[in-house]
Amino acid sequence: MSKKSQLVFAMVAGELSGDILGAGLMAALQKSHPDARFVGIGGPRMEALGFESLFAMEELAVMGIVEVLSRLPRLLKVRASLIKDITALKPDCFIGIDAPDFNIGLELKLKARGIKTVHYVSPSVWAWRPKRIFKIAKATHMVLSLLPFEKAFYDKHQVPCTFVGHTLADDIPLRSDKAAARQLLELDADAEYLAILPGSRGGELKQLAEPFVKAALLIKENFPDIRFVTPLVNQKRRDQFEQALKDHAPDLEIHMVEGKSREVMTAADGILLASGTATLEAMLVKRPMVVAYRVSPLTYRIAKSMMQVNRFSLPNLLAGKDVVPELIQDDCTPEKIAAAVTVELNRDFAPLNAEFERLHQMLRCDASQKAADAVMRLVETKEG
């Protein structure tokens, strides 16, 4: 460990889900080291705990291979600046939270400069581009994985990895309170609601807002009394979604909420959502869901050629079988989405609810504390 009396941690979180994980890790580290300093790139939750952001987190919130290329010069400039600043800071440890295409390159440079590095959230090496594990081994002293099957993959390749579970599984109660969520959001206690979550990034809304809005029109035909509620992460995303609504379904009423995505999902009877961490939250609040995703055709062709698995949503990956419908790319049409949502809203939910509860228990491990303990073991380990 550094001889400094104050521990210093450099961290980079790339998006909303990383901010949640980063804040949980910070809080756990602050319990035993209240004067620890945290510097790098973080979001509002991390900043509320005293995190010092050198750049806005939005800089890294880019989706898709093609989409990243247009932002590459700026991303490289940010990374070069971080390498310089973090090297000068000489932190006790660097923790890259998710954002693997950005963070692993950063970790590689920092590790070569003698800084201990941790990657929090395993990249999906088991799903696509499995050879990345060799770069991860070179770039990190340890990986913190959220999902149990990931550790087995790292163990097989003799790469240090600690399974910590998922903070969402710790935070979300085993029994979610629909009535309380509706009261909080001022929604009708007795109406049937479908939550629509088209993603938190601009690129996601660009791809998904139109088919989701058009699907809602078709769903309304099957369920005339159904109501729709959509959480948007900020005003920019709200403006984007409102434009899609105006363009494609001007007469459709959708109740919009800023933030509060978990409360919206809890309040709903069913959920239509983009693939990503939100699918895990939907599973943990135990609601029937339809998962859809679409990227640019070129991004999809490149990604498909590298895929090692046939599933992409977290509930299905965790279960090791198809428990929720997935509609990707050409299947992400209003007609197919509406048909899938109709089936899910009409089905017997009891077997799926039991499966979701089993998966919830599996991920409930006090993740932030386990992650903090693993980081501190590394910090206290002497080099060589």
Swiss-Prot record:
An example Gene Ontology molecular-function term: phospholipid binding
EC number: 2.4.1.182
Substrates-to-products reaction catalysed: a lipid X + a UDP-2-N,3-O-bis[(3R)-3-hydroxyacyl]-alpha-D-glucosamine = a lipid A disaccharide + UDP + H(+)
Recorded metabolic or biological pathway in which this protein acts: Bacterial outer membrane biogenesis; LPS lipid A biosynthesis
Pfam families, sorted: LpxB
Keyword vocabulary terms for this entry: Glycosyltransferase, Lipid A biosynthesis, Lipid biosynthesis, Lipid metabolism, Transferase
GO biological process assignments: lipid A biosynthetic process
GO CC terms of this entry: membrane
The keyword Isomerase appears for this protein: no
Summary of the function given for this chain in its UniProt record: Condensation of UDP-2,3-diacylglucosamine and 2,3-diacylglucosamine-1-phosphate to form lipid A disaccharide, a precursor of lipid A, a phosphorylated glycolipid that anchors the lipopolysaccharide to the outer membrane of the cell.
Family to which this protein belongs: Belongs to the LpxB family.
Name listed for the protein in its UniProt record: Lipid-A-disaccharide synthase
Species, as recorded: Shewanella sp. (strain W3-18-1)
Gene: lpxB
